[in-house]
C-alpha cells in the first residue's frame, strides 16, 4: 500500500476516543509513573472511575493492595459507608497471582485480557509493571518485555494504562523526564504515551507532566504542568483536585541542586566537549554528566547545541519533550 492509501483507509475508521484528557487515547499503551507516595494508584483509580462513569467497562488489575486495604482506603471518615464506584469498574481478585512466578503472572494476565476482550471489555489499567517483570532495569529484558506486551494488546485491540515507577535512587528535586522511568529508553521508546506525577517541594502538592504523545500535541509540558492536591472527599473517594498550571522549574526553584560542578559541565558541553570527555575532565561517569546537563537545561529553560554529539538539547526540542513523539 502507498502512504496515501493507508491514510485514506485510516480516515474511514471510527475516530479514537480520548479516554482521559489527552493523556490516554483509545488503543494505545500509556505509562503513568512517579516516585513512591506521589499518589499514582489513587490517580489511576480516579481515571478508571471517570471512564467507567462515562459508560465504558474498565478492568483494574491491582497487584498492590489486598481487598481489605482497598476497603480501608475508600471507606468514609466515620466508617459508616464507602464511596460507591461505578458498576462498570471491575477489579479481579489477584491474591493468588501474587504468589506465582512473574512469567506465570504475565501469562495469566494476558489470558484474562483476552477473555475480557471477547466480552467487549477493551480498557485495562495495570498496577503495577514491577509485578509483571521485576528485571526491567536490564535494558534487553525491558525491551523484550515491552515489545511482547504491546504486540499482545494490539492483537486484542485494547487500551492499556501501565503504572510504573522511578528507580529508588531518584530524588524529587529534579525535573521529570523519560529518563526517570525505571527501564528508561528501553521502555519509553515503545510506549505510545507517557505522563508522570512529581512532588512540589516544600508543599503537600503534586503536579502532572506529559512526557510523550504519539497521537496529539503535548499540552502539559514543562511550562504548563498541572498542579493539585489529593483530597479525600466526604463520600470516601480520593480525588486529584486541580489548582491550575505552573512552570515546573518554579515548583522546584531553590530546591534543585544546581551546583557549580553542574554549571561547569554545562559550559564544557556548550564548548562542544562530548559527555565522555567532560566526564574524564571532571572525574565522574558520562551518564552523570548527561543527567547534570539535562537538569541544568530544564532548570534554567535554556538549550544548547553540541557538535560533538550532533544533538541540540533543550526544553522545547529535547527527545523527552517532543511535540509529537516518534
Which residues does each predicted region cover?
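Conserved inter-motif catalytic segment of the P-loop NTP-binding fold
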Residues: 14-15, 19-21, 25, 35, ...
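Phosphate-binding/switch region of NTP-binding enzymes
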Residues: 31-33, 37, 42, 55-57, ...
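Hydrophobic positions on the alpha1 helix immediately C-terminal to the Walker A/P-loop
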Residues: 43, 47
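Active-site catalytic microenvironments for nucleophilic, acid-base chemistry
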Residues: 50-54, 296
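N-terminal pre-Walker A segment at the start of P-loop NTPase domains
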Residues: 1-19
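C-terminal regions of RecA-like/P-loop NTPase motor modules
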Residues: 117-118, 155, 200-326
Amino acid at each position: 500500500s502507498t502512504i496515501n492509501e493507508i491514510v485514506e483507509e485510516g480516515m474511514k475508521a471510527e475516530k479514537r476516543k480520548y479516554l482521559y484528557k489527552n493523556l490516554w487515547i483509545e488503543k494505545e499503551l500509556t505509562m503513568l509513573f512517579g516516585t513512591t507516595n506521589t499518589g499514582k494508584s489513587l490517580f489511576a483509580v480516579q481515571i478508571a472511575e471517570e471512564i467507567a462513569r462515562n459508560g465504558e467497562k474498565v478492568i483494574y488489575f491491582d497487584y498492590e493492595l489486598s481487598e481489605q486495604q482497598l476497603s480501608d482506603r475508600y471507606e468514609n471518615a466515620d466508617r459508616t459507608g464507602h464511596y460507591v464506584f461505578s458498576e462498570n469498574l471491575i477489579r479481579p481478585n489477584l491474591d493468588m497471582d501474587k504468589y506465582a512466578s512473574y512469567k506465570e503472572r504475565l501469562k495469566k494476565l494476558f489470558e484474562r485480557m483476552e477473555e475480557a476482550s471477547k466480552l467487549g471489555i477493551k480498557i485495562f489499567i495495570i498496577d503495577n509493571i514491577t509485578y509483571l517483570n521485576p528485571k526491567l532495569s536490564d535494558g534487553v529484558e525491558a525491551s523484550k518485555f515491552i515489545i511482547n506486551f504491546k504486540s499482545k494488546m494490539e492483537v486484542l485491540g485494547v487500551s492499556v494504562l501501565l503504572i510504573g515507577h522511578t528507580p529508588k535512587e531518584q530524588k524529587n528535586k529534579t525535573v521529570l523526564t523519560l529518563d526517570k522511568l525505571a527501564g528508561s529508553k528501553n521502555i519509553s521508546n515503545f510506549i505510545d504515551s507517557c505522563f508522570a506525577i512529581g512532588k512540589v517541594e516544600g508543599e503537600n502538592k503534586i503536579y502532572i507532566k506529559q512526557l510523550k504523545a504519539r497521537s496529539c500535541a503535548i499540552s502539559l509540558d514543562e511550562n504548563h504542568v498541572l498542579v493539585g492536591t489529593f483530597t479525600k472527599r466526604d463520600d470516601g473517594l480520593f480525588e486529584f483536585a486541580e489548582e491550575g498550571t505552573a512552570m515546573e522549574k518554579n515548583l522546584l526553584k531553590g530546591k534543585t541542586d544546581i551546583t557549580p560542578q553542574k554549571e561547569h559541565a554545562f559550559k564544557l558541553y556548550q564548548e562542544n566537549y562530548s559527555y565522555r570527555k567532560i566526564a574524564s575532565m571532571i572525574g565522574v561517569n558520562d551518564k552523570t554528566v548527561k543527567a547534570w546537563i539535562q537538569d541544568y537545561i530544564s532548570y534554567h529553560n535554556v538549550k544548547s547545541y553540541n557538535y560533538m554529539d550532533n544533538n541540540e538539547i533543550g526544553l522545547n526540542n529535547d527527545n523527552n519533550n517532543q511535540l509529537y513523539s516518534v
